């Protein structure tokens, strides 16, 4: 009988070693908001008005990759805008070497106010919608967004200066 108990315990122990505990998802490295960027790892903010080189360097370190492209659009209504874009959907906008705005389509980067790209319209906080030449837009506390063509989810979020043509 004792051997049977020992064997049962050994089998149970071996089986328990095969069970994995689900890991908590990694927290986002930053949160975008109406004033700029709040890194998760620091209380220091990256607000609008900061120098372009420092902002790009800081965000590149946070995302563990540099931007895929840095371009300048001289035909923006607000004046020439230089944009640093990451492949996942984040774009930072600069004018005269200063951080002035962002756009985001990356669902892994949260936006203050309870928004996230690709978030279902039904899961969004209370907002009012307006149909414009861009599509169905919304705003809350100086954070703006655009729904997908079928109005089912968030396609794009932004704050500050952008280069949209309406």
Predicted regions and their residues:
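Bacterial N-terminal signal peptides that target proteins for export
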Residues: 1-8
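C-terminal motif of bacterial Sec signal peptides marking the signal peptidase cleavage site
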Residues: 14-17
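Bacterial signal peptide processing site
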Residues: 19-21
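A cross-family detector of function-defining hotspots
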Residues: 23-28, 47-98, 113-166
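Acidic/histidine-rich, surface-exposed loop or edge segments in extracytoplasmic proteins
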Residues: 31-42, 101-110
């Amino acid at each position: 009988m004792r051997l049977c108990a020992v064997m049962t315990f050994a089998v149970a122990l071996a089986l328990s070693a095969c069970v994995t505990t689900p890991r908590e998802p990694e927290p986002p490295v930053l949160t975008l908001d109406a004033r700029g960027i709040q890194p998760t790892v620091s209380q220091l903010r990256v607000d609008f008005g900061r120098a372009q080189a420092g902002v790009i360097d800081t965000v590149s370190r946070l995302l563990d990759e540099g931007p895929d492209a840095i371009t300048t659009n001289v035909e923006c209504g607000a004046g020439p805008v230089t944009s640093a874009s990451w492949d996942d959907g984040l774009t930072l906008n600069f004018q005269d070497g200063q951080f002035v705005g962002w756009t985001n389509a990356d669902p892994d980067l949260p936006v203050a106010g309870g928004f996230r790209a690709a978030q279902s319209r039904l899961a969004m906080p209370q907002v009012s919608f307006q149909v414009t030449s861009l599509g169905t837009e919304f705003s809350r506390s100086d954070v703006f967004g655009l729904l997908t063509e079928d109005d089912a989810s968030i396609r794009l979020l932004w704050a500050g200066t952008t280069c949209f043509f309406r």
